[in-house]
Structures are given as structure tokens and as C-alpha cells.
A protein has these predicted regions:
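An amphipathic, hydrophobic-aromatic interaction surface with interspersed Lys/Arg
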Residues: 1-262
């Protein structure tokens, strides 16, 4: 984060404002991130974006190209979407809560559902797939996506009604939904760093294309991956489903790495 001082004149009087300006994606506030999402969706021109992003006073509503250029330089990092992020910038939408940092609290089965919906959306660009992804990703406190087959104690949680929640998510602001999608792309890039064999990344992607809907996701069958993970240990299938997703990723990543060495 850096401090920016803007000096200007109004009616012959000198004025100045000081703003704290982020230097990287992880320093964006929720409000700033939503503005970036609007810009990426083509809903804001450069002048309006800068006006709102820097919270410029109304006297600077019509900034000239020179001023606009220098403001743009302060946030030029926003041009490059090749970002790795382990958390969600938007922590909640109403009563729906995002996973905490590093996907803590998400089990392997839950992640497979989320990522399958994400891959479908990226390939087919159907809003219904994005709505389903967000419905699975942002859930209420106490909700679970996959019930244990044989719970050892009374459940304090209740099962998510995915169909009902998807219909509710469909009514959210499209900008919010796009911001969540973009953030999840950043999460996937973090996973590619932490688990490079399980989540291989094509670094040849153009920096302005990463995160855009037209980028095609590879065909990933999490069902096949899960079957290979479980193998002949069918009796322990539930254990694998309920395993923290990052624990499963670590085991799978090691298996793939070891197999490639042979």
C-alpha cells in the first residue's frame, strides 16, 4: 500500500487530498475489487473508473487525459490478471460466507462439486453454471454440502439445498458474481503453485486473457480423479470424501509427481 497526494485548484484556491493506494491485487478492498470487476465487464470507462476508485472530489469529475494517465500509472498492476491468491476478497454476500483462506473447512467432495461447476461455466459460459458454482462456494454458517454416510454424532449442521440456493444466487448483482468468478480464477492459480502436478498451469496465457470467460478450461473429470484416488479402498470412500481438500491435493500431487518419475 502506498500513499498518494493529489494537488488541485478550485476557484483559484489550492486543495489537496491524500489516498491510500493498493500496489497489488491482495490489497484491494471489496469496494475496489467490485469496481475492477465492473471495468473488466466493460461497464465503466477509464475516467469513471478512476474517479470512483480514487474517490475523487466532485470538482475533479472531468479529469483531463494527462491527469488520467498519471492516475492509471498508480494502478497499472490491474492490467495483469495472472494473480495467485489464497483467499476471497468478498468475504460474504448477505448471509452467505466465502471459504476462509486456503480453502480451510472445504472437504474434498465439496471442492469437487465447486470446481466441476466452475469448469462447466468456463467452457459453456452458461449463467446457470456460474450460479451453481457460487451456490456451492458461498454457503451459510452451519451448512454442509455432503452428508456423512454414517455420522458418529448428531449433526449440528444442515444440508445445503443446492437447487434452491442456485435460484437465489441467480438474482445477485452480475458484477458481484463476476467478481467471485475472477477471484476463484486467482484461487486456482494459487493451487497451481501449491500443487503443480494436480493443477498444471499454462503460463503462456496472455496476461489480459486470464480470468476472462472465453478462456477455455481443460476437461477435468473429478469423478475419475476421485476413483483413482480411492482405488480398491472402497470401504474408506467416505474418509476420502470428508478429507480436507488441501490434504487430498497434497496426496494426489505426490502420487502424480512420483508416477511421472517412473
Amino acid at each position: 500500500m502506498k500513499q498518494l497526494r493529489l494537488d488541485y485548484r478550485v476557484m483559484g484556491c489550492s486543495r489537496s487530498i491524500i489516498r491510500q493506494v493498493p500496489e497489488r491485487w491482495t490489497e484491494l478492498t471489496q469496494e475496489q475489487f467490485l469496481l475492477v470487476a465492473q471495468m473488466y465487464r466493460g461497464e465503466l470507462d477509464d475516467s469513471t473508473f478512476l474517479q470512483r476508485f480514487f474517490r475523487l472530489p466532485k470538482q475533479l469529475k472531468n479529469i483531463d487525459e494527462f491527469f488520467q494517465y498519471h492516475l492509471s500509472e498508480q494502478v497499472e498492476f490491474l492490467v495483469d490478471c495472472r494473480v495467485r491468491m489464497d483467499h476471497f476478497i468478498i468475504p460474504s454476500v448477505g448471509k452467505l460466507q466465502a471459504p476462509v483462506a486456503r480453502l480451510k473447512g472445504i472437504n474434498f467432495a465439496h471442492f469437487m462439486f465447486i470446481d466441476t461447476a466452475f469448469n462447466h461455466y468456463v467452457r459453456n459460459e452458461r449463467d446457470a453454471d456460474l450460479d451453481r458454482m457460487i451456490a456451492l462456494l458461498y454457503i451459510k454458517q452451519g451448512e454442509i454440502v455432503v452428508l456423512p454416510d454414517n455420522p458418529t454424532k448428531p449433526l449440528s449442521s444442515h444440508l445445503l439445498d443446492v437447487r434452491k440456493r442456485t435460484a437465489e444466487v441467480a438474482k445477485l448483482d452480475p458484477v458481484v458474481k463476476y467478481a467471485i468468478f475472477l477471484n476463484y480464477v486467482f484461487i486456482k492459480r494459487w493451487l497451481s503453485k501449491a500443487f503443480p502436478f494436480l493443477f498444471p498451469l499454462d503460463e503462456s496465457d496472455d496476461k489480459e486473457e486470464v480470468g476472462k470467460k472465453k478462456t477455455k478450461a481443460p476437461l477435468v473429470s473429478w469423478l475419475d480423479i476421485f476413483d483413482a484416488f480411492v482405488g480398491d479402498d472402497i470401504a474408506q470412500m467416505e474418509k476420502y470424501q470428508q478429507m480436507p481438500c488441501t490434504t487430498a491435493f497434497r496426496l494426489l500431487d505426490k502420487r502424480i509427481r512420483d508416477a511421472q518419475k517412473k
